[in-house]
Amino acid sequence: RRSSDLKMLGTMSLLLRGLPFIFQGQEIGMTNTNWQSVDEFDDLNTVDQYHLALKAGLSEKDALDKIGRLSRDNARTPMQWNTSSNAGFTTGIPWLRLNDNYPDVNVAAQEKDADSVLNYYKKLIALRKSDTYKDIFTYGKTIPVFLEKEMLMAYCREKDDKRILVLGNFGEKKEALHLSAEPKKLLLSNMNHTEIGQDIILAPQESAVVLL
């Protein structure tokens, strides 16, 4: 996936009301694994689904492809720390195979890249925990807006006299929006924009956090 997609998904979830939860690897954009055999799975439900697919007439390859996309084990593979053996996770034998992309997708590489998914997550967390905005993100109301926009997820976080608009364009086309008043400040953009106005055009997979 593109890094803009991953940053947008993080924006839309971490700024909702409730306790933010980051599952291992989410913050660097770890992906599903390219499974080679049903024997590589640890999840019993996945193995059961594989055998049911064979009984239904699927070939071994098709059955493996289908269960591989949906298996819970995709979210359980070892954390990809660096490019060393076993992605720096262990000197032993990991319980699940490593994702083949760990030489490219790992913490060490993203720490050095200012525009990485990992460093964007750090900005998100810093914004949510900042002295200026932590109360609104922790205790503020969450009000859905722009409901007529099918491919747009948008909500306002509101508390006392503060309002923050969170926008995410899930579509493959630009989304044009008009605000009722000039916004005060663009707090965060997954595409590194620094300014925003009353008329907003969001690119595909663009997110924006706007102080109203």
Model-found features: residue ranges?
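Short, surface-exposed beta-strand/loop "edge" segments at domain boundaries and coil↔beta transitions
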Residues: 162-163, 194-196
